[in-house]
Amino acid sequence: MQIFVKTLTGKTITLEVESSDTIDNVKSKIQDKEGIPPDQQRLIFAGKQLEDGRTLSDYNIQKESTLHLVLRLRGGMQIFVKTLTGKTITLEVESSDTIDNVKSKIQDKEGIPPDQQRLIFAGKQLEDGRTLSDYNIQKESTLHLVLRLRGGMQIFVKTLTGKTITLEVESSDTIDNVKSKIQDKEGIPPDQQRLIFAGKQLEDGRTLSDYNIQKESTLHLVLRLRGGMQIFVKTLTGKTITLEVESSDTIDNVKSKIQDKEGIPPDQQRLIFAGKQLEDGRTLSDYNIQKESTLHLVLRLRGGMQIFVKTLTGKTITLEVESSDTIDNVKSKIQDKEGIPPDQQRLIFAGKQLEDGRTLSDYNIQKESTLHLVLRLRGGI
């Protein structure tokens, strides 16, 4: 039968083989055709490196299957070069190769002149005269290739998810042009993009130079969701987080978005709007939270405390609370545990009825304090 062997240079060799041929036999046939010694050949099929003593049938290699031939350089190694388009190039190199040499190999493969190439490894741009070993680049390391456009420049666009996109632009490009480039890379229609630089939203007809956007500037991309809206979340440190949400999102959903951005577990988040703590199962529209509303994020520090609530029947409930919890919050926790609606609860501590908007610390309620719960019967006064 015939099989094909594809080399890293893209050349395809055709071989006549039997299913019972060993990988050794195949390497000998390649040596006969191409002059490459078997000990410098690695054959790959279906992502697996083939072992010399095994046969083609062991690997289920059938007629017209294609094997990939990778050269094992004496003292050499393979590295990968990833381009901005996501394409990965494989190169055969030596540790002693200079960055210049590597750029020449990329030119041989891709036709990109070395003076338009910038190579990045571990966040550093590599200098032409240095060697791979100078940068501790080892076998199967991945370099990133960025193109240096003549007369152009690179800028960065950071999305709300934290992803950074690199764009090749000219100072004379309009914001429209930039949005088109983002669409090419990310598939986001221009009419759903808002670009922010130095706190200003950029207008479509203006140019990068109008906004003094220079090389390696970072723009921020905010999505304009159809039917969605943006809200802001302000932390106690004064930092403001921007979130893309829907009115139908639950407070749970919002906390998950904050976790995605800031890494704070939902169970440590308390969200406050218009002076009220927001409950997980309710939606933004339940609280009349509209576009560009600002919520306040308070962290629930581990290191809360327990208090007890004693009912008239003599039952004692244990609650996990914070000193900063409002009486409202406490009543919600009692509802969660006992099913009693907050408007039917009266809480008494040290002979005083507790008011909903006040906090436990306002009443000097400390760990292991006992509150008394009295029910307000419907129709009662």
Curated annotation (Swiss-Prot):
Gene3D superfamilies: Phosphatidylinositol 3-kinase Catalytic Subunit, Chain A, domain 1
GO cellular component entries: cytoplasm; nucleus
Cross-link Glycyl lysine isopeptide (Lys-Gly) (interchain with G-Cter in ubiquitin), where in sequence: K6, K11, K27, K29, K33, K48, K63
SMART domains per UniProt: UBQ
Domain Ubiquitin-like: 1-76, 77-152, 153-228, 229-304, 305-380
Compartments, as annotated in UniProt: Cytoplasm; Nucleus
Propiece residues: 381
Keyword Ubl conjugation: yes
InterPro entries linked: Ubiquitin-like_dom, Ubiquitin-like_domsf, Ubiquitin_CS, Ubiquitin_dom, Ubiquitin_ubiquitin-like
Principal subcellular localisation of the protein: cytoplasm
Coiled-coil residue spans: none
Placement of covalent cross-link Glycyl lysine isopeptide (Gly-Lys) (interchain with K-? in acceptor proteins): G76
The organism's place on the tree of life at top rank: Eukaryota
Keyword entries, A-Z: Cytoplasm, Isopeptide bond, Nucleus, Repeat, Ubl conjugation
Annotated family: Belongs to the ubiquitin family.
Role summary: Ubiquitin exists either covalently attached to another protein, or free (unanchored). When covalently bound, it is conjugated to target proteins via an isopeptide bond either as a monomer (monoubiquitin), a polymer linked via different Lys residues of the ubiquitin (polyubiquitin chains) or a linear polymer linked via the initiator Met of the ubiquitin (linear polyubiquitin chains).
Further remarks about this protein from its record: For the sake of clarity sequence features are annotated only for the first chain, and are not repeated for each of the following chains. Ubiquitin is encoded by several different genes. Ubi3 genes code for a single copy of ubiquitin fused to the ribosomal proteins eS31. Ubi4 is synthesized as a polyubiquitin precursor with 5 exact head to tail repeats.
The protein's name: Polyubiquitin
Organism encoding this protein: Kluyveromyces lactis (strain ATCC 8585 / CBS 2359 / DSM 70799 / NBRC 1267 / NRRL Y-1140 / WM37)
Organism phylogeny: Eukaryota, Fungi, Dikarya, Ascomycota, Saccharomycotina
